[in-house]
Amino acid sequence: MAEPRKSGLISHGIAAQNRKARFNYTIKDTVEAGIVLRGAEVKSLRMGRATLSEAFAGERDGEMYLFNMYIPEYQGGVLSRFDTKGPRKLLLKRKQIDQLLGAIARQGSTVVPLDVHFNPRGLAKVTLGIAEGRKQHDKRQAIAKRDWERDKARILKNR
């Protein structure tokens, strides 16, 4: 039996991660939201070419949007052009929007995207984190703890 052809596209699973978000922020809560994308944006995202490092979520006209998420143009011969860093609408219920806006207003938190993934049905979703910024000494402690965990695992492995 012949193997299925691998196209290099992501049908489900993580398409892009914001690794710096977990380092620069303390994540208090997470929310999963749908994201409105056009066809060429979805194709480019399925190729795993998105960047979330400068992205953030915010409110505009009572709706939540994702700003500064970079999705490069799809090079597959599609004529439709799109703004690579334009705002993208997030699909959330009103209760979730109120929860996010309340956390931003009350606690001085921010909403950062942690990852963009495709669920088992093939729909694009973004995981948002309600986050507080870390101080420099907290970042140093996180680095020291991570290094110690790595060294401890290495020592236990070599026993």
Swiss-Prot record:
PROSITE patterns, sorted: SSRP
GO BP annotations listed: trans-translation
Coiled coil: none
Major localization listed first in the record, in broad terms: cytoplasm
Subcellular location(s) of the protein: Cytoplasm
Protein's job: Required for rescue of stalled ribosomes mediated by trans-translation. Binds to transfer-messenger RNA (tmRNA), required for stable association of tmRNA with ribosomes. tmRNA and SmpB together mimic tRNA shape, replacing the anticodon stem-loop with SmpB. tmRNA is encoded by the ssrA gene; the 2 termini fold to resemble tRNA(Ala) and it encodes a 'tag peptide', a short internal open reading frame. During trans-translation Ala-aminoacylated tmRNA acts like a tRNA, entering the A-site of stalled ribosomes, displacing the stalled mRNA.
Protein family per UniProt: Belongs to the SmpB family.
Protein name: SsrA-binding protein
The species this protein was found in: Acidiphilium cryptum (strain JF-5)
